[in-house]
Protein backbone atom coordinates (compact mmCIF):
# COMPACT_ATOMS: atom_id res chain seq x y z
CA UNK A 1 0.00 0.00 0.00
CA UNK A 2 1.41 3.38 -1.03
CA UNK A 3 2.57 5.47 1.92
CA UNK A 4 2.34 9.26 2.01
CA UNK A 5 5.68 11.09 1.98
CA UNK A 6 6.17 14.34 3.90
CA UNK A 7 9.26 16.36 3.01
CA UNK A 8 11.19 18.34 5.62
CA UNK A 9 13.57 20.05 3.23
CA UNK A 10 15.63 17.20 1.82
CA UNK A 11 14.49 14.75 4.51
CA UNK A 12 11.73 12.38 3.40
CA UNK A 13 9.41 11.04 6.10
CA UNK A 14 7.27 7.98 5.30
CA UNK A 15 6.30 4.73 6.95
CA UNK A 16 8.16 2.61 4.40
CA UNK A 17 11.35 4.71 4.21
CA UNK A 18 14.33 4.60 6.61
CA UNK A 19 13.27 6.09 9.92
CA UNK A 20 13.88 9.75 10.76
CA UNK A 21 15.10 10.65 14.24
CA UNK A 22 13.40 13.59 15.92
CA UNK A 23 15.76 13.93 18.84
CA UNK A 24 17.21 16.38 21.28
CA UNK A 25 16.21 17.68 24.69
CA UNK A 26 12.89 18.17 26.42
CA UNK A 27 13.17 21.92 26.99
CA UNK A 28 15.86 24.46 26.19
CA UNK A 29 17.76 24.77 29.47
CA UNK A 30 20.54 26.96 28.12
CA UNK A 31 22.14 27.91 24.83
CA UNK A 32 25.34 26.01 25.68
CA UNK A 33 23.56 22.79 26.63
CA UNK A 34 21.45 22.92 23.47
CA UNK A 35 24.61 23.30 21.38
CA UNK A 36 26.28 20.40 23.18
CA UNK A 37 23.32 18.04 22.78
CA UNK A 38 22.67 18.99 19.17
CA UNK A 39 26.32 18.53 18.23
CA UNK A 40 26.34 15.04 19.74
CA UNK A 41 23.16 14.06 17.92
CA UNK A 42 24.53 15.37 14.62
CA UNK A 43 27.80 13.47 15.07
CA UNK A 44 26.08 10.18 15.91
CA UNK A 45 23.34 10.35 13.27
CA UNK A 46 25.82 11.26 10.54
CA UNK A 47 28.02 8.33 11.55
CA UNK A 48 25.05 5.93 11.44
CA UNK A 49 23.40 7.43 8.36
CA UNK A 50 20.14 8.39 10.12
CA UNK A 51 18.13 11.41 8.88
CA UNK A 52 17.90 13.84 11.79
CA UNK A 53 15.71 16.70 13.09
CA UNK A 54 16.61 18.49 16.35
CA UNK A 55 13.79 18.83 18.90
CA UNK A 56 13.30 20.97 21.99
CA UNK A 57 10.62 23.15 23.54
CA UNK A 58 11.10 26.87 24.12
CA UNK A 59 8.21 26.93 26.62
CA UNK A 60 6.70 24.04 28.58
CA UNK A 61 3.34 25.70 29.09
CA UNK A 62 1.65 22.65 30.62
CA UNK A 63 3.91 21.94 33.62
CA UNK A 64 2.07 20.47 36.61
CA UNK A 65 3.40 23.11 39.00
CA UNK A 66 3.51 26.86 38.47
CA UNK A 67 6.97 26.76 40.08
CA UNK A 68 8.43 24.32 37.52
CA UNK A 69 10.92 25.51 34.91
CA UNK A 70 9.23 26.37 31.61
CA UNK A 71 12.04 27.43 29.31
CA UNK A 72 13.61 30.59 27.89
CA UNK A 73 10.47 31.77 26.14
CA UNK A 74 9.63 32.53 22.52
CA UNK A 75 12.13 35.25 21.64
CA UNK A 76 15.21 33.68 23.25
CA UNK A 77 14.14 30.21 22.11
CA UNK A 78 13.99 31.27 18.46
CA UNK A 79 17.47 32.82 18.75
CA UNK A 80 18.85 29.51 20.02
CA UNK A 81 17.12 27.55 17.26
CA UNK A 82 18.49 29.91 14.61
CA UNK A 83 22.01 29.45 15.96
CA UNK A 84 21.63 25.67 15.97
CA UNK A 85 20.43 25.71 12.37
CA UNK A 86 23.27 27.97 11.25
CA UNK A 87 25.96 26.10 13.18
CA UNK A 88 25.00 22.51 12.46
CA UNK A 89 22.75 22.74 9.40
CA UNK A 90 19.96 20.85 11.18
CA UNK A 91 16.21 20.97 10.75
CA UNK A 92 14.32 21.89 13.93
CA UNK A 93 10.97 20.89 15.43
CA UNK A 94 9.29 22.65 18.35
CA UNK A 95 5.81 22.93 19.84
CA UNK A 96 3.40 25.85 20.15
CA UNK A 97 0.67 26.42 22.72
CA UNK A 98 -1.12 29.53 21.50
CA UNK A 99 -2.21 30.77 18.08
CA UNK A 100 -0.14 33.95 18.59
CA UNK A 101 3.06 31.87 18.72
CA UNK A 102 2.48 30.04 15.45
CA UNK A 103 3.80 32.49 12.85
CA UNK A 104 6.92 33.60 14.78
CA UNK A 105 7.79 29.93 15.25
CA UNK A 106 7.03 29.06 11.61
CA UNK A 107 9.45 31.79 10.54
CA UNK A 108 12.33 29.92 12.21
CA UNK A 109 11.70 26.18 12.58
CA UNK A 110 10.99 23.47 10.01
CA UNK A 111 8.30 21.46 11.80
CA UNK A 112 5.63 22.83 14.15
CA UNK A 113 4.31 20.45 16.79
CA UNK A 114 0.73 20.38 18.05
CA UNK A 115 0.86 19.26 21.71
CA UNK A 116 -1.21 16.28 22.82
CA UNK A 117 -3.24 18.26 25.33
CA UNK A 118 -4.17 20.80 22.62
CA UNK A 119 -4.64 18.52 19.62
CA UNK A 120 -8.38 19.17 19.33
CA UNK A 121 -8.20 22.97 19.67
CA UNK A 122 -9.56 24.09 16.32
CA UNK A 123 -8.31 27.69 16.42
CA UNK A 124 -4.77 26.50 17.06
CA UNK A 125 -5.02 23.84 14.34
CA UNK A 126 -6.27 26.40 11.81
CA UNK A 127 -3.48 28.85 12.66
CA UNK A 128 -0.89 26.10 12.24
CA UNK A 129 -2.40 24.89 8.97
CA UNK A 130 -2.25 28.37 7.44
CA UNK A 131 1.54 28.52 7.76
CA UNK A 132 1.98 25.71 5.24
CA UNK A 133 4.65 24.24 7.50
CA UNK A 134 5.14 20.56 8.19
CA UNK A 135 3.04 19.63 11.23
CA UNK A 136 3.63 16.97 13.88
CA UNK A 137 0.47 16.06 15.77
CA UNK A 138 0.90 14.39 19.15
CA UNK A 139 -1.89 11.90 19.81
CA UNK A 140 -3.62 12.87 23.07
CA UNK A 141 -3.44 10.28 25.83
CA UNK A 142 -7.24 10.37 25.99
CA UNK A 143 -7.94 9.94 22.26
CA UNK A 144 -8.15 6.59 20.48
CA UNK A 145 -5.99 5.94 17.40
CA UNK A 146 -9.10 5.82 15.22
CA UNK A 147 -10.09 9.37 16.19
CA UNK A 148 -6.84 10.85 14.87
CA UNK A 149 -8.31 11.02 11.38
CA UNK A 150 -10.57 13.85 12.53
CA UNK A 151 -7.59 15.98 13.53
CA UNK A 152 -5.87 15.29 10.22
CA UNK A 153 -9.06 16.31 8.41
CA UNK A 154 -8.97 19.69 10.18
CA UNK A 155 -5.51 20.35 8.79
CA UNK A 156 -6.59 19.26 5.31
CA UNK A 157 -9.58 21.60 5.49
CA UNK A 158 -7.12 24.34 6.42
CA UNK A 159 -5.14 23.64 3.26
CA UNK A 160 -2.25 21.72 4.80
CA UNK A 161 -1.64 18.05 4.07
CA UNK A 162 1.95 17.95 5.37
CA UNK A 163 0.96 16.13 8.55
CA UNK A 164 2.90 13.64 10.67
CA UNK A 165 1.21 11.77 13.52
CA UNK A 166 2.99 10.88 16.75
CA UNK A 167 1.92 8.40 19.43
CA UNK A 168 3.06 8.87 23.02
CA UNK A 169 0.88 6.29 24.78
CA UNK A 170 -2.63 6.17 26.19
CA UNK A 171 -3.98 6.58 29.70
CA UNK A 172 -4.11 3.25 31.50
CA UNK A 173 -6.02 3.94 34.67
CA UNK A 174 -4.66 6.80 36.76
CA UNK A 175 -1.14 8.19 36.30
CA UNK A 176 0.13 5.53 33.91
CA UNK A 177 0.59 5.20 30.16
CA UNK A 178 0.73 2.18 27.88
CA UNK A 179 1.49 1.96 24.16
CA UNK A 180 -0.93 0.02 21.97
CA UNK A 181 1.23 -1.46 19.22
CA UNK A 182 -1.88 -2.15 17.13
CA UNK A 183 -2.76 1.55 17.24
CA UNK A 184 0.05 2.56 14.91
CA UNK A 185 -1.51 0.84 11.90
CA UNK A 186 -4.93 2.26 12.79
CA UNK A 187 -3.45 5.77 12.77
CA UNK A 188 -1.90 5.11 9.37
CA UNK A 189 -5.21 3.87 7.99
CA UNK A 190 -7.42 6.74 9.20
CA UNK A 191 -4.92 9.39 8.03
CA UNK A 192 -4.46 8.21 4.46
CA UNK A 193 -1.17 6.49 5.33
CA UNK A 194 0.41 9.65 6.70
CA UNK A 195 3.77 9.17 8.41
CA UNK A 196 3.46 7.88 11.97
CA UNK A 197 6.25 8.29 14.50
CA UNK A 198 6.71 7.10 18.08
CA UNK A 199 7.53 9.33 21.06
CA UNK A 200 9.18 6.71 23.22
CA UNK A 201 10.35 9.24 25.84
CA UNK A 202 6.94 10.51 26.91
CA UNK A 203 5.44 7.03 26.68
CA UNK A 204 7.73 6.14 29.59
CA UNK A 205 6.16 8.69 31.94
CA UNK A 206 4.66 7.35 35.14
CA UNK A 207 3.32 9.98 37.47
CA UNK A 208 3.46 10.24 41.22
CA UNK A 209 -0.29 10.58 41.96
CA UNK A 210 0.40 13.13 44.68
CA UNK A 211 3.45 14.87 43.20
CA UNK A 212 3.99 17.84 40.92
CA UNK A 213 6.52 16.22 38.57
CA UNK A 214 6.37 13.25 36.24
CA UNK A 215 8.32 10.12 37.04
CA UNK A 216 9.61 7.83 34.35
CA UNK A 217 10.92 4.41 33.39
CA UNK A 218 14.19 5.30 31.69
CA UNK A 219 15.48 1.77 32.21
CA UNK A 220 12.92 0.48 29.72
CA UNK A 221 13.52 2.97 26.91
CA UNK A 222 15.43 0.51 24.73
CA UNK A 223 12.91 -2.32 24.88
CA UNK A 224 9.96 -0.02 24.27
CA UNK A 225 11.67 1.72 21.35
CA UNK A 226 12.63 -1.62 19.80
CA UNK A 227 9.06 -2.86 20.10
CA UNK A 228 7.59 0.25 18.51
CA UNK A 229 10.02 0.41 15.62
CA UNK A 230 9.40 -3.26 14.84
CA UNK A 231 5.91 -2.25 13.66
CA UNK A 232 7.41 -0.27 10.79
CA UNK A 233 7.27 3.46 11.50
CA UNK A 234 8.37 6.67 9.82
CA UNK A 235 10.37 7.92 12.75
CA UNK A 236 11.33 7.93 16.41
CA UNK A 237 10.92 10.86 18.80
CA UNK A 238 13.57 10.82 21.52
CA UNK A 239 14.83 13.03 24.32
CA UNK A 240 18.30 12.76 25.84
CA UNK A 241 20.27 14.55 28.51
CA UNK A 242 23.91 14.33 29.65
CA UNK A 243 22.73 14.28 33.28
CA UNK A 244 19.11 13.04 33.41
CA UNK A 245 18.97 13.18 37.21
CA UNK A 246 19.43 16.95 37.03
CA UNK A 247 17.40 17.70 33.90
CA UNK A 248 14.91 20.52 34.38
CA UNK A 249 12.05 18.53 32.86
CA UNK A 250 11.30 14.81 32.38
CA UNK A 251 14.74 13.60 33.37
CA UNK A 252 13.38 10.24 34.60
CA UNK A 253 12.35 9.41 31.02
CA UNK A 254 15.39 10.80 29.19
CA UNK A 255 18.00 8.59 27.56
CA UNK A 256 21.50 9.31 28.93
CA UNK A 257 23.26 11.17 26.13
CA UNK A 258 26.34 8.96 26.40
CA UNK A 259 24.21 5.94 25.41
CA UNK A 260 22.85 7.53 22.22
CA UNK A 261 25.08 5.80 19.66
CA UNK A 262 24.63 2.33 21.13
CA UNK A 263 20.87 2.90 21.38
CA UNK A 264 20.47 4.16 17.82
CA UNK A 265 22.62 1.35 16.43
CA UNK A 266 20.06 -1.14 17.75
CA UNK A 267 17.07 0.90 16.55
CA UNK A 268 18.51 1.28 13.05
CA UNK A 269 19.18 -2.46 12.82
CA UNK A 270 15.54 -3.21 13.65
CA UNK A 271 14.23 -0.58 11.24
CA UNK A 272 16.44 -1.87 8.42
CA UNK A 273 15.32 -5.44 9.02
CA UNK A 274 11.59 -4.71 9.22
CA UNK A 275 11.62 -2.58 6.08
CA UNK A 276 13.50 -5.24 4.13
CA UNK A 277 10.45 -7.51 4.33
CA UNK A 278 7.82 -7.68 1.59
CA UNK A 279 4.42 -6.35 2.62
CA UNK A 280 2.20 -9.21 3.79
CA UNK A 281 -1.56 -8.82 3.37
CA UNK A 282 -3.28 -11.03 5.95
CA UNK A 283 -6.79 -9.62 5.45
CA UNK A 284 -7.41 -11.34 2.12
Swiss-Prot record:
Principal location listed in the UniProt entry: cytoplasm
Classification via SUPFAM superfamilies: Aldolase
Gene3D superfamilies the record matches: Aldolase class I
Catalytic activity: D-arabinose 5-phosphate + phosphoenolpyruvate + H2O = 3-deoxy-alpha-D-manno-2-octulosonate-8-phosphate + phosphate
Keyword Transferase: yes
EC number: 2.5.1.55
Keyword Transferase: yes
A biological process term (GO) from this entry: keto-3-deoxy-D-manno-octulosonic acid biosynthetic process
Top-level taxon of the source organism: Bacteria
Keywords: Cytoplasm, Lipopolysaccharide biosynthesis, Transferase
GO annotations of cellular component type: cytoplasm
Pfam families on file: DAHP_synth_1
Annotated family: Belongs to the KdsA family.
Name used for this protein in its record: 2-dehydro-3-deoxyphosphooctonate aldolase
Species name: Salmonella paratyphi A (strain AKU_12601)
Lineage start: Bacteria, Pseudomonadati, Pseudomonadota, Gammaproteobacteria, Enterobacterales
Record gene name: kdsA
Amino acid sequence: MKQKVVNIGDIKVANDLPFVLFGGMNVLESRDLAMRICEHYVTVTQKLGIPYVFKASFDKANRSSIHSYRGPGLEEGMKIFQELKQTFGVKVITDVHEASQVQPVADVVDVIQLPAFLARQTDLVEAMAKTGAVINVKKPQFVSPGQMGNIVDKFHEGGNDKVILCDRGANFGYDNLVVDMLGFSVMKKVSGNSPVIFDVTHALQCRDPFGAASGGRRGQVTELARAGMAVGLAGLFLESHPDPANAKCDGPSALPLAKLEQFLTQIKAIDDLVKSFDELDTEN
